[in-house]
Amino acid sequence: MSQSQMMLQQKDLYTVQAKPQVPFGHLRALWFQITGTLCNLTCVHCFISCSPTNHSLEFLAPETVYRYLDEAVQLGVREIYFTGGEPFMHKDLLAILERSLQVAPTSVLTNGTLITPRVAEALGRLQASSPYSLEIRVSLDDVDEAQNDAVRGKGALRKALQAMQRLQAQGIPPIVAVTEYLYANASRDAASDHGEEQSQGEGSGFYRKFRDFLLSNGIDKPRLKMIPVFAMGQLEGAVPLAQYVTTSMLEGFDSDTLQCTSSRIVADGGVYACPLLVGEPQARLSTDSLADALQPCTLYHTACHTCYVTGMTCSNY
């Protein structure tokens, strides 16, 4: 039986089983998919297949963001995140960040390629004048230009590094997010060629490689966020034996470790349970009210299993 046939068989079995739910606790983090699925890059592993031409989810209007920010304050939000697509494609992003930084600590997830000297200076001014902290999280895949750009596009590493150095100069030490796409592929190849034991311990070397790269390029307090590979978007069907969470798996499990118990994301079309599942009809919990979306959600997707197994959250830490 092929891998794709096994996944289909597993999915068919899952559809007749009760799908587990987890309760909502408190609103720790509110996310905004501010540029929808529109991005200036077309990364080969993007979990929602963002690109310059993907209009599945459109930009959020500033008025929409402000309305949800006001509601989030009343609900006790502690952190705000902006993601995409590529957030710096949004012409009103700086004004939106100024408003958000009056509410809570705010982070932007970006590929870094649009952070020009002017933008970096504006971010530095926002950081200096705001009551809450501003974090910028830049995505990379490798410290080798050829390897990284094979995933993200020509010039992506050079531009991202320039962005990080500009942010550092403005007093905003960047967080670097690394998807384990290239490492996972290399580990599978190593295990295939040399046996399972050969690949053990490689993860720490992967981490050190990025840390040393950042230090050597002037990022003197490197912070890394490692992100597992998800069997969705551009990689749907490509990850071996993607699985689902079952009710029995939650017995004795602390569901508070799952981000869907304490965060929600606003995107084109409403409020969704998880940043990984924006645009998914089953993950949409409300069309226009954040309060209405603070309800139990169903763990119906393979991404839920990845979070369950790895402890992954989309937050900075």
Please state what every model-predicted region is.
Residues 225-317:
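Accessory C-terminal segments flanking Radical SAM cores
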